[in-house]
Amino acid sequence: MALRKRSPHGLGFLCCFGGSDLPEIDLRDSHPLQYLEFSGPIPNPEELNVRFAELVDELDLTDKNREAVFALPPEKKWQIYCSKRKEQEDPNKLATSWPEYYIDRINAMAAMQNLYETEDEETDKRNQVVEDLKTALRTQPMRFVTRFIDLEGLTCLLNFLRGMDHTTCESRIHTSLIGCIKALMNNSQGRAHVLAQPEAISIIAQSLRTENSKTKVAVLEILGAVCLVPGGHKKVLQAMLHYQAYAAERTRFQTLLNELDRSLGRYRDEVNLKTAIMSFINAVLNAGAGEDNLEFRLHLRYEFLMLGIQPVIDKLRQHENAILDKHLDFFEMVRNEDDLELARRFDMVHIDTKSASQMFELIHKKLKHTEAYPCLLSVLHHCLQMPYKRNGGYFQQWQLLDRILQQIVLQDERGVDPDLAPLENFNVKNIVNMLINENEVKQWRDQAEKFRKEHMELMSRLERKERECETKTLEKEEMMRTLNKMKDKLARESQELRQARGQVAELVARHNESSTGPVSSPPPPGGPLTLSSSRTTNDLPPPPPPLPFDSCPPPPAPPLPPGGPPIPPGAPPCFSSGPPPSHDPFSSNEAPLRKKRIPQPSHPLKSFNWVKLNEERVSGTVWNEIDDSQVFRILDLEDFEKMFSAYQRHQACMQEGPQRERGNVRDGGAASRPLPAVEASAHRTEKASRSMVSATGAKKELGSTEDIYITSRKVKELSVIDGRRAQNCIILLSKLKLSNDEIRQAILRMDEQEDLAKDMLEQLLKFIPEKSDIDLLEEHKHEIERMARADRFLYEMSRIDHYQQRLQALFFKKKFQERLAEAKPKVEAILLASRELTLSQRLKQMLEVVLAIGNFMNKGQRGGAYGFRVASLNKIADTKSSIDRNISLLHYLIMILEKHFPDILNMPSELKHLSEAAKVNLAELEKEVSILRRGLRAVEVELEYQRHQARDPNDKFVPVMSDFITVSSFSFSELEDQLNEARDKFAKALTHFGEQESKMQPDEFFGIFDTFLQAFLEARQDLEAMRRRKEEDERRARMEFMLKEQREKERWQRQRKVLAGGALEESGEFDDLVSALRSGEVFDKDLSKFKRNRKRPGSQVPEVTRERAINRLNY
């Protein structure tokens, strides 16, 4: 028997599927090899053609191959005919030339496989039988295949596959059996018979449940090829549904996705399997109903996306296999094309199918003015009534709605469903019967509600205790920190006091020696001596009167400092009758500014619209330390002139739209903060109190809604308070869940047990009894038992001495740390941001480069600058390149820094606090500090009053508030000192950059730099994105060239094989289909079409591709 050649379609690709192994040749014939001798002379051409046609009919060749073999010369035809006839008449092969032999052997193997454990030798013999059958089905005449079908040979194979044990399933026998079915399907009659069997494809799909990768590859090749055969696509989908139940999959295709993501450890087997899976996925998506049905492709692809195929595809790119990448490219290209087509239906560029709001808006827009709009409203209305709680069968009911909609979308005009998955084996009645009995649900719900109430009560008590413990702990920690700070400050001030006393004594002695008459010691230089502690001040003797100096010494000889170097230049002058010497912060005795040497461009350039800094303001600033002449030696000025030439669309560039505004919020104090306790309650509205109405309170307790209702029904109830105010007060008391006496005790004890939360205290401040209320209540105090709930509460609270001041002090105490914590970060942000800007060397270098660029671009009044206003930084992006409108001067600046000054790119890491400082409004911050100051003063006044009053044993106001004042006063003084330091640092930062202190606030100054840094980072991202797009375009072009070259090579090899005369020994058309599916040639036409569409002018596919890259993260 002549060796059969492999299909040319598989050359170069079958190795990826494990199908390239050459058949094992075993010469067991005892006869020696002989030369082929013709049995007779060549008959006449007519007779030869008749005999040859009979042989060709038995081989069941395709029309293309029939034409090729009939075109052979007569000698070749006669040689082939004689060879086949001799092979058929060989007596040594008589036993195995009939299908009955193989059917009997396979039936016997099926019956005996479960009786005893087979050895390796027996397994090899059985495998050889199946292999021989596979060879016979491929090489024997057509009558062999026909008789095999008539004798129910296919049923024999399917029964064996259905009933084989685990050992056989994992053996080579399983792979050979799948090969037999594949060989049977390699001709038209066998293929039709397999497709006619109702369970054939489903049983073949069961073979996916094995660990043998070669078996899986063979099964997937059959299923993928069947998808391409008319009528086969739907059978494959049914087979995958059958496999879902057979393998207990959660969803269809779950096993395939797991295998696609799993690593086998062997590169060859892994790539073969993953390529087979991807070829099958592409076939099932694009064949059958997927050829021209967009809805079907979107529906089926959504299953794969929900299973997480997109991250797996990204992972598969790491294998760098050409065939596998080809299938991956086809999957993504078809997906992008379908998404674009769906978006076109709604006049969109891309639809985010993960966004429910966007999809709803599109549907609403499409149906708003159609007769279907009421139906949409009805659907939404009934969806609102669907169950949402996680109990019963709520999920199944939503799933039913989903599958019904899927079925509506997929059904064609004839009512045929291309996919039975949505409602396959889904019985609505069974789902409804699975719901839990309503009575049982009610019983458990009542019990759960009882436990919930008990739980809430315990949680309330626990939270109250936790708040108490937390408050005490915080107060203790704050007191310890304050105590340590006070000790340090006391030691520091004691040391300063000793030094000051020594200085005073020394100055007095010097003065007594140098003058006659009664004189007194002058104050220390730098102003009068000030001490922060009143206690240490009392220990000092009264200061002597100042000396009657007529004038200060001249500047070269300043007053002698106390035991140290001369007074710094910034110190205030001594008392003098003459005018003080003028001091200009920008004036200096430094050398004059060096002359600018700026290279001249060969032609006019676009201008950088900066605000030039006056030369007299440069001294003493950062600009005095900058030498931009060094930058000109590094810059590529010729390239710069090309990029920013003024001749190319100069006006269009200069008149571009206004500068893009940043979304920085610098409202600093926009959020309203509660006034201190001293100013609260009198001006509060009752609108907030009405918002406290709640539906809770079914429990009958003091202040509950039911109690309020019953109280309001009493006939003899006395009320003198305004009705609405009384109602709001009752609602507040019901939320407090405390009696009047408990509230009174909590206020007297300054809420030691944390019964009154901060928000409740804020509400209580709105219900302080006024003078008119107190007078009316006093008139009816003998009828206190008849008073309404609100009236009695106000009356009892009015009996507390200074109730309003106590309540305000308690509220201020609870809010103090919170307000202090809000103010401190703002002060620190100004302080740190000022330091960072002043000390940043990278910012200084960047300004040097910008100054050089601006001087090179600008002429006339704007040129020759020694510095510029910092606000000009945000105008860099306004100047666009003459060559590319997408490139601005800011982009070009970053390219210069990347090339010559890469360290400057780390500038944002030095300026970490700019964004916070840019949000600080200094006026609002000072207002917050002033509120704290007035609040502390009001508490001190009330504390002084309470100290002189007779106290109730339960009254804790004096001890609690004394400790609070001690700690909070020290903390507040620290905040004030820090704020003063921040003001000083900010003023120095303004001077450092040549700005005027009186004309710029922190939010504006820091906002300029913050906006620039954001634009700087965005420009870097733009450049990086441009580079990535360029690399992607180059990679795609290389890939397309390689694919085109590979297809040409394969096409040339196939033509060469056909011309060589081996067409008769090629495999059949089903093998051709499998090979084309393997290599991806079946999708070449669609790939070329997609690529052509993508290259069309104005195509929006690249935009969709970018959107797709983002959406990959969602799956």
Swiss-Prot record:
Compositionally biased intervals (Pro residues): 540-583
GO biological-process terms attached to the record: actin cytoskeleton organization; determination of left/right symmetry; dorsal spinal cord development; negative regulation of oligodendrocyte differentiation; podocyte cell migration; positive regulation of canonical Wnt signaling pathway; positive regulation of cell migration; regulation of actin filament polymerization
Knockout consequences: Conditional knockout mice lacking Daam2 in myocardial cells do not show any heart defects. Conditional knockout mice lacking Daam1 and Daam2 in myocardial cells show cardiomyopathy, which is stronger than with a single Daam1 deletion.
Domain DAD, residue spans: 1065-1095
GO-annotated molecular function: actin binding; small GTPase binding
Residue segments, region Disordered: 510-605, 655-697
Family, as annotated: Belongs to the formin homology family.
UniProt name for this protein: Disheveled-associated activator of morphogenesis 2
